[in-house]
Amino acid sequence: MAYIAVVGSANVAVGAFPFQKLRVREYNPGRVQTSLGGAGRNIAHNLRLLGEEVELFTALGGDGYARAMEESCRKLGIGLNHALRVPDTRTSTYVYFADERGDMTAAVADTAICDQLDPAYFAERLDALNAAALVAADTSLPAESLEYLAKNLTVPLFVDPVSIEKSEKLTELLPLIHTLKPNRPEAELLSGIPVVDRNSARRAARRLIDLGVKQVFLSLGREGFLAAAEDETVWEPAPEAEVVKTTGAGDALMAALTWAYLRGENLSRMAALGASAAAITIECEKTINPELSAEAVLRRAH
């Protein structure tokens, strides 16, 4: 089985969940949860749950967090054969605050180690990247590294923009991206079209297709998402779900899209399977639902 190369961040996520409505500048009783995360690592974890072989191209520090990350990846079967070790640097760390519904309200990320993932790192590993079935990347990499990948990969490149700020790295690379998974503000920045409803989401997605992206999956959160390709546009409503927490849904969606693409699914079916994976994820208090599987996703999809 050909592996999927996942390129991006691997960090420790510390989440704070208030029991009631979050009060700014006040003490909030709640629960604090520490977990291994990072968009790249989470996508890789979800892909393993879906039964795919995965190699994670990331940077790890020389601290206890890095050792915990390595042990977790070993147990999950996520390959770290091409990961960069930086002994005197902190492993990437991400702290976020959720509201009473579990939705993230704000976050602070210490991701300086990701700057070590420079073009030279990828040039040394280009053969391994191009030996993959496809490459799924987040935008925690330096802009010049994303450009290097986009211009030198010979396999499809799937990209999760991750944030508005990091989305700016993609503005000149859109014609080189196979599949893009932006949320509303990321799509607005990249397309130049305000997304206020389903019709404007369609226009933004079509604009991204016109700019050269082959497939766009534009997430509108709890409403669902819009999928677009050159000759097709599909609206995929969010499935019924008992929402526990929404953090991690985008990573599950990204993983399911890559998995579905490699299954040979069409745009509409990719959208349905992606929505199914996201729904399964938000029904668990963990960022990654251990109950996610190919069978569960197929069973849940319409």
Segments the model singles out, each with a brief description of its role:
Residues 10, 185-186, 252:
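Alpha-helix/helix-capping structural signal
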Residues 1-6, 167, 198-302:
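Conserved phosphate-binding/catalytic region of the ribokinase-like
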Residues 1-59, 64-78, 242-244:
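Glycine-rich phosphate/adenosyl-contacting loop at the front of the ribokinase-like
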Residues 134-203, 223-225:
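Conserved beta-alpha-beta core of the PfkB/ribokinase-like small-molecule kinase fold
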Residues 15, 107, 190-192, 228, ...:
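Residues that scaffold the ATP/ADP-binding catalytic core of kinase and kinase-like folds
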